[in-house]
Amino acid sequence: MSRVCQVTGKKPMVGNNRSHAKNATRRRFLPNLQNHRFWLEEEKRFVQLRVSTKGIRLIDKKGIEVVVAELRARGEKV
């Protein structure tokens, strides 16, 4: 399973670790992804999404029905 948020599209980024001596070694910054179940009232079922914590906050703000409609319009299976 890829490390991509289904709502925001956040993906891993690359950057550098920096030691005290300012040596640079490559590293990945991973999004804070959570597997989360959301209750869809209109369909009377749970939907499991892999979302970042920012995606969870967006769902709290917009509502799960709106977000699922956007995902389906994008062609994602929910």
Curated annotation (Swiss-Prot):
Pfam families: Ribosomal_L28 (PF00830). It comes from the Bacteria. GO terms for biological process: translation. InterPro entries: Ribosomal_bL28, Ribosomal_bL28/bL31-like_sf, Ribosomal_bL28_bact-type, Ribosomal_bL28_sf. Keywords: Ribonucleoprotein, Ribosomal protein. Disulfide bonds: none annotated. GO terms for molecular function: structural constituent of ribosome. Residues 1-21 are annotated as: Disordered. One of its GO terms (cellular component) is cytosolic large ribosomal subunit. PANTHER family: 39S RIBOSOMAL PROTEIN L28, MITOCHONDRIAL, LARGE RIBOSOMAL SUBUNIT PROTEIN BL28M. Belongs to the bacterial ribosomal protein bL28 family. This is Large ribosomal subunit protein bL28. The lineage of its organism: Bacteria, Pseudomonadati, Pseudomonadota, Gammaproteobacteria, Alteromonadales. The gene is rpmB.
